[in-house]
Amino acid sequence: MALFSKKDKYIRINPNRASREKPQAKPEVPDELFSKCPGCKHTIYQKDLGNDSVCPNCGYNFRISAHERLNLTVDENSFEEMFTGIETKDPLNFPNYQEKLALTREKTGLDEAVLTGTASIKGHKTALGIMDSNFIMASMGTVVGEKITRLFEYATEHKLPVVLFTASGGARMQEGIMSLMQMAKVSAAVQRHSAAGLFYLTVLTDPTTGGVTASFAMEGDIILAETQALVGFAGRRVIESTVREKLPDDFQKAEFLMEHGFVDAIVKRGDMRDTLATLLAFHGGQA
């Protein structure tokens, strides 16, 4: 009675016939090959950003290092670095601070969060400072304050204009009150430079916040800013909880500050060198 015979409820497979090949691993894509734009959220092929690291879709300015900015700004081989080798005394003996400094120096190739020296911008000699957010968020400690102060003192003595690219997360907490003192210290040097009739120009880059904003970043004779740069003192949430109001979406953006008279002009990164040269030519080093 084959009609009612039992059948196996499973299928027999010869194990020798089964494929024993391991699934192929997916090809690895290098992390540095693509970047996601914080502005338009598009994924961008790294080469499409160009040398100035600007999003080709929305114009967002990616953060760049001090040396990258130096190459975009000054005449070739004109930069002479000054005030190197200054080290913090670590006044609070803050845990792991010295180790963090050592690792950051190795990673960035900088001795501190600001690069200082003299350079020419289309033939105009200037004292130049560039803060780098890759170095502990360009927080302002005693060495940063000392280097910028010395830069202004040198510029005053040699009758040079000062161009300073600012970027900072604020005062460096690992140095306590000593970091806050740098606000007044640098501002005093700025005032002496100004009293000598010399020209000081600041360029606010993303982010410029905290004590740097509350002092020398906003003391320039002319204040420029990069597109969509975050500029402010306290954080947005702190302000909203204090005033108990919802702030505008573009609050603390460079465009908002220019609209309210705190910034003189917003300059595209690709136009910055020409703009600086023009302003230096207009002023001739004099304010």
Curated annotation (Swiss-Prot):
Uppermost EC category: transferase
Pathway the protein contributes to: Lipid metabolism; malonyl-CoA biosynthesis; malonyl-CoA from acetyl-CoA: step 1/1
ZnF bounds (C4-type): 37-58
EC nos: 2.1.3.15
Subcellular location: Cytoplasm
Primary subcellular site in the record, as a coarse category: cytoplasm
Database matches in PROSITE patterns: COA_CT_NTER
UniProt GO MF annotations: acetyl-CoA carboxylase activity; ATP binding; carboxyl- or carbamoyltransferase activity; zinc ion binding
Catalytic activity: N(6)-carboxybiotinyl-L-lysyl-[protein] + acetyl-CoA = N(6)-biotinyl-L-lysyl-[protein] + malonyl-CoA
Keywords: ATP-binding, Cytoplasm, Fatty acid biosynthesis, Fatty acid metabolism, Lipid biosynthesis, Lipid metabolism, Metal-binding, Nucleotide-binding, Transferase, Zinc, Zinc-finger
Cofactor: Zn(2+)
Annotated GO CC locations: acetyl-CoA carboxylase complex
UniProt protein name: Acetyl-coenzyme A carboxylase carboxyl transferase subunit beta
Organism: Streptococcus sanguinis (strain SK36)
Gene: accD
